[in-house]
Regions:
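Short, charged, surface-exposed loops that flank catalytic or proteolytic processing sites
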Residues: 1, 59, 174-188
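Basic, flexible linker segments flanking DNA-binding modules
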Residues: 1-58, 127-128, 132-138, 210-218
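Mobile genetic element proteins and their domesticated derivatives, centered on retroelements
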Residues: 5, 22, 59, 76, ...
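Conserved, non-catalytic sequence blocks in retroelement Pol enzymes and Pol-derived host proteins
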Residues: 14, 48-50, 66, 128-129, ...
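Mobile-element integrase/transposase regions
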Residues: 15, 27-83, 91, 95-113, ...
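RNase H-like two-metal-ion nuclease catalytic core shared by retroviral integrases
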Residues: 117-119, 127-171, 185, 190
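C-terminal, beta-rich DNA-binding module of retroviral/retroelements integrases
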Residues: 197-252
Length: 252
């Protein structure tokens, strides 16, 4: 769009052109797609992690191959930098898929301090009525000391960054020839990652930096390097004898 063109003109050619001027010329050429009126940004309560790897968001989205075969794309992004850590194509995303791709991602980028996902069964069993205990992904997070955060049901904006990433990804994919196989789709995703992380300025980042620049600009958080204590407030009733029970690590 106009912002991206202005960024490239400034950073690669030393030419300063107002975004409004670029928008006007694109609109005159019929190259601007009208978008629905959105809620003002000020109406949202925004959270942004202070450090890279302080919080990873994950989710998967749906895509169809040229022969209408259904596929699912699993995405991991860094909350602080919007850096796309991993984007992989699968016939179907399962709990085993999530665990495998998470392990590959931490091998490349380190262990995050926390993760944020929705309440899909591939990520958590917390809404399953206590049946079956933790799934493999939850057990892995506990083993690594990673704080797991799940969105409140019916509040999709909690995972808004990865949802917005899906929109950007699909817009790019729609402009490419439709892949005929999972392998072809993965090659397209790899090409998109290079473009998105390293060559595309992000409007939500300071100075419209690229996600790769923001991801490498500060030290990474990890389970042993926490930016807050995550203290929890608990309210209890005092019994008739005036006694209180204190808990440590969930035990009285």
């Amino acid at each position: 769009g106009p912002q991206t063109i202005a960024w490239h003109l400034h950073h690669h050619h030393g030419i300063a052109v107002a975004v409004s001027t670029i928008h006007r010329h694109l609109a005159a050429a019929g190259l601007i797609t009208p978008t629905p009126q959105k809620r003002p940004r000020s109406s949202y309560i925004r959270f942004e992690a202070d450090q890279p790897n302080e919080r990873w968001q994950a989710d998967f989205t749906h895509w169809w191959l040229a022969d209408h075969t259904h596929t699912e794309i699993l995405c991991w992004i860094d909350d602080h930098a919007r850096y796309a850590l991993s984007v992989t194509a699968h016939r179907r995303v399962t709990g085993a898929t999530v665990l495998t791709e998470f392990r590959k991602t931490i091998a490349l980028h380190g262990i995050p301090y926390s993760t944020l996902t929705d309440n899909g069964m591939v990520f958590t069993t917390r809404l399953a009525g206590g049946k079956g205990g933790r799934n493999a992904f939850e057990a892995e997070l506990r083993h690594l000391g990673v704080t797991q955060i799940n969105s409140t049901p019916n509040h999709p904006t909690t995972c808004g960054k990865v949802e917005r990433f899906h929109q950007t990804l699909k817009k790019w994919l729609k402009a490419q020839p439709r892949a005929t196989t999972i392998a072809e789709l993965q090659a397209q995703l790899d090409e998109f990652l290079a473009e998105y992380n390293h060559r595309r300025p992000h409007r939500s980042l300071p100075q419209h930096a690229t996600p790769a620049t923001a991801y490498t600009a500060r030290p990474k958080a990890d389970p042993a390097n926490r930016t807050d204590t995550h203290n929890r407030v608990r309210r209890d009733r005092v019994d008739t004898t005036g006694a209180l029970s204190l808990r440590l690590a969930g035990r009285p």
